[in-house]
Amino acid sequence: MDKVRWAPKRVKGRLKEIRTHMGQFDFTIWTVVGPAADLDSYIEWRHECLYEKRSDKRQAMGLCFQGFEDHGPIIWLPKPPRTAEEIGTLAHEACHALVEMMDWMGTEIKRDTDEILCHGVGHIVSNVLAELRKR
């Protein structure tokens, strides 16, 4: 299957959206970058549903919203990652998103399946950074 890559686009306020398709797993992870104030309306728009709002968004360096039946998880970052710490936060949130994907696949994380997780983190991080640099 061909990789589908979307350039960052502005959606729902001041957020930039990046779609990362996970290849043969036919699973999409969304990353949005921008102010926390626009996040609730984005999630409700993307998933066409209400969700349990989190009050800790304003202090967070990044978050991963999971558990949606109709779409993949959403990684949120307050700004484009540039420092090692910010890129590390993206990788951290990517791990949460990939655990969701592996649950969806029915695959337990263990030594003989950890390559899916490790490769996936690299794929998400490199895709998000590449798409943000295109701006």
Annotate each language-model stretch with its function.
Residues M1-R54:
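Short, charged/polar N-terminal "headpieces" of proteins
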Residues A36, D40-A84, A97-M101:
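Active-site scaffold of zinc-dependent metalloenzymes
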Residues A60-F65, M105-I109, H119:
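Short C-terminal domain-edge/linker segments immediately following a structured domain
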Residues P81, E85, I109-D112:
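Short, solvent-exposed segments of well-ordered alpha helices
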Residues E85-A94:
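Short alpha-helical catalytic segment bearing the HExxH-like zincin motif
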Residues A94-R111:
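Catalytic Zn2+-binding segment of zinc metalloproteases
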Residues E108-R135:
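Post-HExxH zinc-binding segment in Zn-dependent metallohydrolases
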